[in-house]
Amino acid sequence: MHKLLKLAAMGTAACALLAGMAPVANAQEKQNVEVLHWWTSGGEASALEVLKKDLESKGISWTDMPVAGGGGTEAMTVLRARVTAGNAPTAVQMLGFDIRDWAEQGALGNLDTVASKEGWEKVIPAPLQEFAKYDGHWIAAPVNIHSTNWMWINKAALDKAGGKEPTNWDELIALLDNFKAQGITPIAHGGQPWQDATIFDAVVLSFGPDFYKKAFIDLDPEALGSDTMKQAFDRMSKLRTYVDDNFSGRDWNLASAMVIEGKAGVQFMGDWAKGEFLKAGKKPGEDFVCMRYPGTQGAVTFNSDMFAMFKVSEDKVPAQLEMASAIESPAFQSAFNVVKGSAPARTDVPDTAFDACGKKAIADVKEANSKGTLLGSMAHGYANPAAVKNAIYDVVTRQFNGQLSSEDAVKELVVAVEAAK
């Protein structure tokens, strides 16, 4: 009944939602899209300007609806409230299973026309298509491929530690100990559940892509309750000892700033963090180092920002299709992702304009896609539905904060996931 109410609210909102959005041919009135997103940090906002300007050049005005919060949780809360109130946005930045949830309600538009014409099927990796399509139809336009198993290291601090990038767990711990001896915070981290889970993503992946897939994508109880999972929690406990006392509630971009300013040695974060370094005028290889979390080389846990369009009347569809087409154009994919810090959602975009970290990201995604190790990120909504993700978040955060032992965390993880399925 709740879903029906949502859809009814959307139906009544369709006309009012995009009022004033006339065809391009009507010079007196621009087409318009109202866009809900959570790209509010410096680097992210700069990237968003690329899309705004691209659409404006095509005669489509942009009404901005930003909601702060790096994981998108707050944005989805606002979206639910807007839809319930009968006032849904035109286009919404979404991740993974959130897209499927709205598609199952029949709330999203159909992008097949533009997708077929432009051959999206051939150039967008299959793991992304699992979320950009529903029941055989394109429902969302992937903007990028962010990978989450990155480390962002202050170059000066690394040089003081000998300059060697860690390739395994023991070398990572030795580096963190060195950072501590230098008098800086070893790990810049924000104590928010999605950030805790981002680290856990990488830690679990370091035990191998097969284990990660069994645990977080297949939700295999044996993997979730295994000794390997206990080892992963043990490593989280160890990493917790390298975080400063003021980490609770810190936004991710403020943690990035700690590394940028030399106050911390490393941040474990997706490649959206690179946008913060670039915004601060820092250069890869000179001021900071980007590398995969030790033990995850050759595999990529991804999330992909996508824009899903809500159903509107036929006269409003051209603007939505124009926006989708603009998002998937190779020129935009390059320009946007160079600024955003991510890899293009298309595999045919040249890496010419990208910096060293960007070139590595593109190469890593291609390698992982060909090897079957391009895996949806648990922490960012591409491994399992929101209920399961949130159940995992709860256990991971409590364990990271010392409220659960590793043994108890493993037991609770199995129970929590089973209950949330």
Swiss-Prot record:
Q: Which Gene3D superfamilies match?
A: Periplasmic binding protein-like II (3.40.190.10)
List each coiled-coil range.
Answer: none
Give the record's keywords alphabetically.
Answer: Periplasm, Signal, Sugar transport, Transport
Please tell me one Gene Ontology term that the record gives under cellular component.
periplasmic space
Q: Where does the protein end up?
A: Periplasm
Q: Which InterPro entries match?
A: Bact_solute-bd_prot1, SBP
- What is the protein's major site of localization? periplasm
Query: Any keyword DNA repair?
Result: no
Query: Is Transport a UniProt keyword of this protein?
Result: yes
**What is the annotated signal peptide range for this record?**
1-27
**What's this protein's family per the entry?**
Belongs to the bacterial solute-binding protein 1 family.
As for what it does, the entry says: Part of a binding-protein-dependent transport system for a sugar.
What protein am I looking at? Probable sugar-binding periplasmic protein
- Organism of derivation: Brucella melitensis biotype 1 (strain ATCC 23456 / CCUG 17765 / NCTC 10094 / 16M)
